[in-house]
Amino acid sequence: MTVTANQVLRPRGPQIERLTDTRAKVVIEPLERGYGHTLGNALRRVLLSSIPGFAITEVEIDGVLHEYTTVEGLQEDVLEVLLNLKDVAIRMHSGDSATLSLSKQGPGVVTAADIKVDHNVEILNGDHVICHLTKDTAINMRLKIERGFGYQPAAARRRPDEETRAIGRLVLDASFSPVRRVAYAVEAARVEQRTDLDKLVIDIETNGTIDAEEAVRTAADILSDQLSVFGDFTHRDRGAAKPANNGVDPVLLRPIDDLELTVRSANCLKAESIYYIGDLIQKTEVELLKTPNLGKKSLTEIKEVLAQRGLSLGMKLENWPPAGVASHGMLG
């Protein structure tokens, strides 16, 4: 355990207690009083809403035109089959989408293990029941798998050309999150003579496509990334962009193409040898308005895009361009 300059305790590394293959407890201590609820609530919300995963988003079933179609020899109605498909636990090793198929001859039970997969896709709950065939009939499906996070209703993912979509393509509400349940508790902890400290205990259950430790680590990374922007309050001077880690802020080394300006604005800047964001922010409004074919509308666009990144025109940079940045707009 270490203590920072302002005497705020830094907790030890997390302790992992695996309860089952899909459930574990993560313990973090010691924490300053009140930090248990602060961190526990934040981690719980991120774990439930923002951990990426895979889900079945679209289904085509031979002979089924819509969700209310009746299928001869199928015990369940189509809506129930779609609900069962939403609970299939899927993991992909690479890529963001895939199309799988399922074919089964009845009578008998159809499970997730009947889905045909390749080396890139795993089904973690193969015994999960999808439907029952009561007669000597076959069922054939095509399943679209996509990567995402959180919960996305079907209506939110319908494309503008929805009216022309193929008849029989059923769009599902998708729950991408691999985290099924998260609860946390704050218990008392002590260090030497201090007895007013917190111990955070997170109880997390997943669908098996990710282990609890990795889920908590991912949630912590997301929180850390979101909070990192507040560091600028301390380290950035209002009139100048300060280098990070005794170097140049990586954002300033990004090409102006990353700003996604209109083609007209981008071409005007490049014609004036403005290739990097660092080149651009050192220009004043007056200087840019002197650029041929760049008017007030383009200037407004540039200012708005920079403001979204916490930057502005007329900023001062020391030692620009840094070593490795060539005048022709390529990193050396």
Curated annotation (Swiss-Prot):
Q: What does this protein do?
A: DNA-dependent RNA polymerase catalyzes the transcription of DNA into RNA using the four ribonucleoside triphosphates as substrates.
Q: Which family does it belong to?
A: Belongs to the RNA polymerase alpha chain family.
Q: How does it assemble?
A: Homodimer. The RNAP catalytic core consists of 2 alpha, 1 beta, 1 beta' and 1 omega subunit. When a sigma factor is associated with the core the holoenzyme is formed, which can initiate transcription.
- Where does the secretion signal sit in this chain? none
Q: Which reaction does it catalyse?
A: RNA(n) + a ribonucleoside 5'-triphosphate = RNA(n+1) + diphosphate
Its EC number(s): 2.7.7.6
What keywords does the record list, in alphabetical order?
DNA-directed RNA polymerase, Nucleotidyltransferase, Transcription, Transferase
Q: Which SMART domains match?
A: RPOLD
| Gene3D superfamilies given in the database record | 5' to 3' exonuclease, C-terminal subdomain, DNA-directed RNA polymerase, insert domain, RNA polymerase, RBP11-like subunit
The protein's name is DNA-directed RNA polymerase subunit alpha
Query: What Gene Ontology terms for biological process does this UniProt record contain?
Result: DNA-templated transcription
List the InterPro entries hit by this protein, alphabetically: DNA-dir_RNA_pol_insert, DNA-dir_RNA_pol_RpoA/D/Rpb3, DNA-dir_RpoA, RBP11-like, RNAP_asu_C, RNApol_insert_sf
Could you state one GO cellular component term attached to this entry? DNA-directed RNA polymerase complex
Question: What domain notes does the record hold?
Answer: The N-terminal domain is essential for RNAP assembly and basal transcription, whereas the C-terminal domain is involved in interaction with transcriptional regulators and with upstream promoter elements.
* Taxonomic placement: Bacteria, Pseudomonadati, Pseudomonadota, Gammaproteobacteria, Lysobacterales
Pfam families the record matches: RNA_pol_A_bac, RNA_pol_A_CTD, RNA_pol_L
Which residues lie within the region annotated Alpha C-terminal domain (alpha-CTD)?
A: 248-332
